Amino acid sequence: MSEQSRPIVEVAVGILLKNSSNVLMGKRPDGKPYAGYWEFPGGKLEPNESVALALCRELMEELGIEISLDPSHYQELMIIEHDYPHAYVRLHVCLVQQWQGEPVGLEKQELSWQSLWHPQLTVDPVLPAAWPMIEYLQAYLQK
């Protein structure tokens, strides 16, 4: 199926960056498509919801953290589309560099801080759409 014959699912994705080198990834829980795969936190936009508000809501629901939408703490980095067997998604990828609270897996998901600068991640498997995000962020931070 092509994107034209499937609805596009809008998703807000938050890359939490700690100490300019570590990003937080979560393991998809059982019962979800791609269960056991690692991804960046986030979720679907609700009808008429902005990316910023969806990101705030999702990070609170999934991790119990509050984020500021101040431009010095948060920014939308990129938009990518990915065609998964279960959904065609448009991912609004946001960099979050400051938050309140300590991230906890409130949906029973495992969490892991991963170094952007090691040759490979220590978690596996990783959702296919996460790789372009990682590569973009590495290039962005090296500017």
Q: What is each residue range found by the language model?
A:
Residues 2-23, 44:
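Conserved N-terminal beta-strand and adjoining loop/helix that marks the start
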Residues 4-6, 138-143:
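Generic C-terminal helix-cap and adjacent flexible tail
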Residues 5-8, 37, 85-88, 105-108:
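A generic structural micro-feature
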Residues 9, 18, 77-102, 116, ...:
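Active-site-adjacent beta-strand/loop module that shapes the phosphate/pyrophosphate-binding cleft
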Residues 22-61:
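Conserved Nudix-box catalytic region and its N-terminal flanking loop in Nudix hydrolases
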Residues 66-77:
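A short coil-to-beta-strand element that immediately follows conserved catalytic motifs
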Residues 95, 103-139:
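NUDIX/MutT-family hydrolases
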